[in-house]
């Protein structure tokens, strides 16, 4: 699989298993990390808070699911019910270039 030039910037933050080793400090890399994590969520699957936390913990080494959930939601990559009990991936995730343009 060929990695886009933009996504290569995230490479130093990934371990050999593809997990995020730490949360990037720079905004562009944070946005790349969010886009990457959103891509790990299944389409049309509804997750409980515990399930989404477990999944985010599986894709990160630093284990901060609350921050990641909030950031994914704030960037319209994750939806949740009003009571915060159920989460699901946004129906359409924009192409990486469009996503970067929107948030940078």
Regions found by a protein language model. Name each.
Residues 59-71:
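Short amphipathic alpha-helical interaction segments
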Residues 41-45, 61-62:
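Short helix-capping/hinge SLiMs at alpha-helix to coil transitions
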Residues 95-104:
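Short, amphipathic alpha-helical interaction segments positioned at domain boundaries
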Residues 43-56:
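Short acidic, hydrophobic short linear motifs in intrinsically disordered regions
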Residues 7-43:
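Short alpha-helical segments that sit at the start of domains
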Residues 85-90:
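Minor-groove-contacting beta-hairpin "wing" of winged helix-turn-helix DNA-binding domains
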Residues 73-84:
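A short, conserved structural fragment
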Residues 35-38, 53-57:
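Amphipathic alpha-helical segments within well-ordered protein domains
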């Amino acid at each position: 699989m060929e990695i886009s030039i933009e996504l290569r910037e995230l490479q130093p933050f990934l371990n050999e298993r593809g997990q995020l080793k730490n949360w990037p400090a720079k905004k562009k890399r944070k946005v790349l990390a969010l886009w990457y994590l959103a891509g790990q969520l299944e389409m049309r699957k509804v997750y409980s808070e515990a399930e989404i936390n477990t999944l985010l913990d599986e894709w990160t080494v630093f284990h901060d699911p609350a921050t990641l959930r909030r950031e994914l939601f704030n960037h319209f990559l994750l939806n949740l019910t009003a009571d915060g009990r159920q989460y699901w991936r946004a129906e359409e995730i924009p192409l990486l270039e469009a996503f970067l343009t929107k948030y940078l």
